[in-house]
From Swiss-Prot:
Gene assigned in the entry: zfpl1
Highest taxon in the source lineage: Eukaryota
UniProt organism field: Nematostella vectensis
Family (UniProt): Belongs to the ZFPL1 family.
Identification of the protein by name: Zinc finger protein-like 1 homolog
Transmembrane segments: 207-227
Membrane topology: Single-pass membrane protein
Zinc finger (RING-type): 53-101
One function term, GO molecular function aspect: zinc ion binding
Disulfide bonds listed in the record: none
Amino acid sequence: MGLCKCPKKKVTNQFCFEHRVNVCEYCLVSSHSRCIVKSYLHWLQDSDYNPVCTLCNGNLSDGDVVRLICYDVFHLSCINNFAQSLPPNTAPAGYTCPNCKNGIFPPEKMVSPVVEQLKQKLSATSWAKAGLGIPVAPLEPLLFSSTVSRKIPEKRPEESLNTSVDHDENKYQRRGAIDWFSRWFGNRVNTKKQTYDDPNASLKRTMMIFFLVILAFVTVTVIFTRVGRNAAANDPFLDPRSNPHIRVEKDS
C-alpha cells in the first residue's frame, strides 16, 4: 500500500513500473494512460516490464490505447480486431483480456475513472455495445401497406334475411301489417338458426300455425261480412220502396 503523490493523496496499491511511484485511478487516466501499472506486490516480485502491446508487439507510445479494468493496456485498434475475430454470437462474458483472461466489460454498478474512460472508448465499437448496455440498433418503425381493396364486399345471407334493419330512405315511412309480418317472420327464421335443443319446438310451431290460420279465417270472415252488408244496403232490389207490388201508405 502506498500514497499517491497527486493532490488527492489517495491510498492505493497500484504501482507504475515506468515512473516507480504509487498511482491512483485518477492519475492512471490523466498522467499514466500508457504506462504499465500493476500491484506494488507484483513489482516487488518482478520489476521487469516491456512497454509494448502484447497483441501486436508495437510500442504503447504509438497510436490510441485503451486500459481495461484489469489495468492491462492495448492499442485500441488491436483490441477491436481481437474482439471482432470472435464469433458474432459471443456473449458479453466471452470477451476477455488476452493476457489475464478477466472480463473486458465492467460490472453494471462498477464506477471509477478507468471504467468511465473504457466505456467512452469502446462505445464507438459495434461489438461492445451489448456488453456496455447500449442498444445495438434503434428499432425501425413497422411499415404498413396502404393498399385498400376496392372490391365491394358481398352481402351475407344472414344480412339479406334480416329485414328488421331500416334503411335511411324508408326508416320514417309508416309500417303496414304486411311489413310487420315479414319482419316478424324474418326474425323467426334467424332465431331457428340458433343451435339449441328445445323439446317443445314442434308444439310451439304447431300452435303458432294454428293461431295464424284462425286469425286469417276470422279476418277474412269479418272482411266479407262488412262487404256483404255494404252491398245489401245499396242494393235497389232489397229496397221495399222500389218494389211496385208493395204499397206504402203515407200518414195523413
